[in-house]
Regions:
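Bacterial N-terminal signal peptides that target proteins for export
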Residues: 1-9, 884
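Bacterial N-terminal signal peptides
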Residues: 7-18
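Intrinsically disordered, low-complexity segments
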Residues: 1-3, 20, 353
Length: 893
């Protein structure tokens, strides 16, 4: 059994260092007894040592009809009611179900469990061939294909480097790094926690997962080469060079190669010399070519804007540096004569991504350099001294590559055929010269191409791999970029399209951002962060894109109610309706309005669509956190009849809000005129409602005096990214803070909780549960104070237990309603951890470390059997099965 819960016995550690409360051998010292007393049933039992317990009433089908109690016994904090302090318990049942209805359909049973543990269940939605839009690809000297994936919808990005065989079969993931590397292997990228036996990646961004290089969550570095001698080289903005080993570790002192910059200046812009200033904002593409022996790196494409022009960088400049020598920057190799108003910048020759007189570059075995000269419609060839030695006629050349053995030259010619679309032709030449003519060509490409090319040689077979390219019969929207790689085999005098092992599922989920579970059906809903939702069977893993009438059902977010209905923020846009639907997506009207639509919700986007969450109570009340003005948030509510709930807060402010009141085309009694909770910080995420009607909201704030878990006390990411789930009573509340607009107390008698933020208290708050992350915003790893679109999603079960994901600790913590830690599971692992390739006959995973792998867990969902974790970086859901150290069942007689 793969067990993932950390179990210790010291309760002080449990409460203050973030470790679970159970420890040692847990057993019943008094097994459960069930005694009927008039209209109640008494359940008594006792346990041997401090541990968590769970008490439930089961129906004749062994389904839970009443979640009676769950919590930690023997902790410093008292357990949540109806449990009492101490290891001996007596819990009464009033004969009703969770919703207060009498339970009459017997026979009935009581189940008591102690000592929750967790074990790996399964993966859902994963695909080794889906890892973001490809930003670069190369072939290594081992013949394998190294592919860097990155982009997702609406700025959701996570850098991934995967390795594939020459035939396109998935082999392994190198970035993010494997979990089984030896301590010390990751240098500045991650620290080894010897006590936890786990890696702790450094987190550089709260917007997107980024362990390696800080660019506000955008991994701007691209793969240059892969070899046994140099490992995998990357180049980033302004020529910064990076390296990892072929095992995924960091072979040098750091990920960044210090003292070398693949750029005409080794100075940091803007504190720079004239060249760095001139290229700080440049035009043209940035194209690199590396020599087959890995010694030389060449650059072509960039040139200064007119207002930054300098004689030191003539138009058409080509640069070069020695990678294995003392060079600290690139120097000019040659200058291709070019005109600033040439055909390269006009319709037909212009590229919409970036255009210049000089585009692609490549180096052959002799050190000759091949450059795409779009100004003169040719590929020009220089020797290793920078002397022009030949050319190849080619209209609009964009990309060039040289066969590493035969010296054959492959040229992509690219043409603008409309707004932001480009057609292309591939030509093969056996040599250069003014009279050179293609010996093979291929033109059956889709009309929209953004090509990258890598030449792979496997014995006598030569394959050309393309990213951003599709065949002419591909069913793509006008500006849709292809997800699959495209492969051509060089057959000598012709190219032949090849269908190889590399193939993502046509309808596979590309990004994983938000999650909601359906405990009644053991299903899980996962958003791509924009407007697509996928539904999966938790037991089988089967499922896919949510559809209605055969077409994609667009929705940024949803919650599953206690009644099993779906409460959906629907539509294609980041603003749109909040409505109630059946499991089959049919409307369910409200009695007071005769409509299933509650309201039009004012939203926004940044890193995906900025959906803050929907919550549904047992009585059918619905809550949504949204904006009443840009980046100003509140929680509103609607009753089970569909009418707005009256709150105490923001009454005057909301009635002057355009998106909430003045622009709403509804009768006044249907308009939202007050906040149940508000205002709240813009850094918020997730809403849940318990069986008593209490509201739980995720906020980027921590309790007063909060101390991070051991090892994270000085981690700037933990302190900045991590917030708390705040429990408010049914009456709601507000965040009271001097720096929060429209903050005002409306109930001086309401309970208040102090926070670790000076001058900030939470009115109406009953409890805080710290440890949930990420919350994006300003500060370390953030962008601006309004860049708050990346949020975590906690969950709450019917026992009142909370599951709190944290991307910094790469774990999920389960706590009872009093805040006692029950269990914590998950350790760092990349995609390969516990992944079993379908081609693996022995059924063993690529990497068996750790037991429950998580890379950047942003959300969770409870069911009766499991906790489902949305692992954003690994692009999958991890099902974690819940088990117990002991369980007893008794009949109710």
């Amino acid at each position: 059994m793969r067990s993932g819960c950390i179990l210790v016995g010291a309760l002080f550690l449990a409460l203050f260092l973030g470790l679970p409360a159970s420890g040692g051998d847990v057993a019943f010292t008094q097994k459960p007894m069930v005694v009927k007393q008039a209209d109640k049933t008494a359940i008594t039992f006792a346990v041997s040592t401090p541990t968590d317990v769970e008490v439930a009433v089961l129906d004749k089908d062994d389904k839970v009809v009443r979640h009676l109690a769950a919590g930690v016994l023997g902790a410093n904090r008292n357990p949540p009611e109806p449990l009492q302090p101490g290891l001996s318990q007596s819990v009464a049942w009033d004969g009703k179900d969770d919703l207060g209805k009498p339970v009459t359909d017997g026979p009935l049973k009581v189940r008591v469990r102690i000592g929750m543990t967790a074990k790996f269940g399964r993966f859902i939605g994963q695909d080794p061939y889906i890892f973001g839009g490809v930003d670069s690809l190369v072939t290594g000297d081992d013949g394998n294909l190294y592919v860097s994936g990155f982009s997702g919808p609406a700025n959701e990005c996570q850098k991934t480097l995967r390795v594939f065989s020459p035939e396109g079969k998935f082999l392994k993931t190198l970035l993010p790094f494997p979990a089984d590397l030896p301590a010390g292997a990751m240098k500045d990228v991650a620290r080894w926690d010897e006590e936890a036996k786990a890696w702790r990646p450094r987190n550089l961004s709260n917007l997107n997962p980024d362990f390696y290089e800080s660019s506000n969550g955008y991994g701007l570095y691209k793969v240059l080469s892969a070899s046994k001698q140099q490992g995998v080289l990357f180049v980033g903005a302004a020529g910064k060079l990076y390296r990892i080993g072929l095992d995924g570790g960091i072979p040098g002192p750091a990920f960044l190669i210090a003292g070398k910059r693949a750029w005409p200046s080794d100075k940091e812009w803007p504190k720079a010399d004239e060249i760095a200033q001139a290229l700080g904002y440049h035009q043209g593409p940035v194209r690199y070519g590396i020599s087959p022996d890995g010694k030389w790196l060449c650059l072509s494409g960039p040139f200064p804007t007119k207002d930054r022009a300098t004689p030191q960088i003539p138009l058409g400049s080509i640069w070069r540096m020695r990678l294995d020598g003392p060079d600290t920057k690139m120097t000019t190799l040659a200058v291709v004569p070019a005109t600033p108003d040439g055909t390269w910048g006009k319709e037909g020759g212009k590229n919409y991504d970036s255009s210049g007189p000089i585009h692609g570059i490549a180096v052959d075995l002799k050190g000759n350099v091949y450059v795409c000269d779009r100004d003169k419609d040719r590929v020009v060839v220089f020797d290793d001294a920078g002397k022009e030695i030949g050319e190849i006629p080619a209209k609009n050349p964009d990309v060039v590559a040289v066969h590493p053995k035969t010296g054959a030259i492959y040229v992509i010619r690219r043409f603008c055929n409309g707004w932001n679309t480009h057609s292309m032709v591939l030509d093969k030449f056996n040599g250069y010269g003014k009279d050179a003519r293609p010996v093979a060509s291929f033109a059956k490409f889709h009309r929209n191409n953004w090509p990258q090319m890598a030449v792979a040689v496997n014995g006598a077979r030569t394959l050309l791999w393309f990213a951003g390219v599709a065949a002419d019969d591909a069913k793509l929207a006008t500006h849709e970029q292809p997800r699959k790689l495209f492969v051509l085999e060089d057959k000598g005098n012709e190219f032949q399209a090849v269908d190889l092992a590399f193939g993502p599922q046509s309808d596979g989920q590309a990004d994983f951002a938000r999650i909601a579970s359906d405990p009644l059906r053991e299903e899980v809903y996962v958003s791509n962060g924009e407007n697509l939702i996928y539904r999966y069977d938790g037991d089988t893993g089967e499922g896919g894109l949510l559809r209605k009438d055969g077409k994609p059902f667009f929705a940024p977010d949803l919650a599953v109610g206690y009644d099993g209905l779906l409460y959906v923020r629907s539509g294609q846009g980041y603003s749109g309706p909040l409505e109630r639907l059946t499991h089959d997506l049919a409307p369910v009207p409200y009695p007071a309005t005769d409509s299933n639509k509650l309201y039009d919700i004012y939203g926004r986007y940044g890193i995906g669509f900025c959906e803050k969450g929907v919550g549904v109570g047992p009585d059918g009340k619905v809550y949504e956190c949204w904006m009443y003005d840009f980046a100003k948030y509140f929680v509103s509510g609607w009753g089970p009849d569909g009418m707005p709930l009256a709150g105490k807060y923001l009454t005057q402010k909301l009635k002057s809000s355009k998106p909430v009141w003045t622009d709403v085309k509804l009768p006044e009694d249907r308009r939202v005129g007050s906040a149940i909770i508000g205002p709240v910080f813009s850094e918020n995420g997730g809403i849940r409602v318990d069986l008593k009607g209490n509201l739980y909201v995720g906020l980027r704030v921590q309790p007063q005096g909060y101390v991070p878990p051991a090892g994270f006390e000085k981690d700037p990411a933990y302190g900045s990214f991590t917030g708390s789930v705040v429990k408010f009573g049914p009456e709601g509340g507000a965040v009271l803070a001097a720096d929060l607009a429209d903050s005002k107390s409306e109930d001086p008698k309401a309970p208040r909780l102090p926070t670790n933020k000076a001058g900030t208290v939470l009115e109406g708050a009953l409890m805080m549960y710290p440890g949930v992350a990420p919350f994006s915003g300003s500060g370390f790893g953030g962008n601006t104070s309004c860049c708050v679109c990346r949020v975590s999603r906690f969950d709450l079960d019917r026992y009142g237990r909370l599951a709190l994901p944290n991307v910094v600790s790469t774990s999920v913590r389960v706590v009872d309603n009093a805040g006692n830690v029950i269990c914590e599971f998950g350790k760092y692992g990349n995609f390969d951890s516990q992944y079993v390739s379908p081609d693996n006959a022995d059924g063993k995973p690529i990497n068996a470390t750790p037991d429950i792998p998580l890379c950047w867990p942003t959300g969770v969902g409870f069911t009766e059997k499991a906790i489902y974790v949305c692992d954003t970086y690994n692009r999958r859901v991890v099902r974690v099965d819940l088990t117990w150290k002991a369980e007893e069942i008794r009949d109710i007689k």
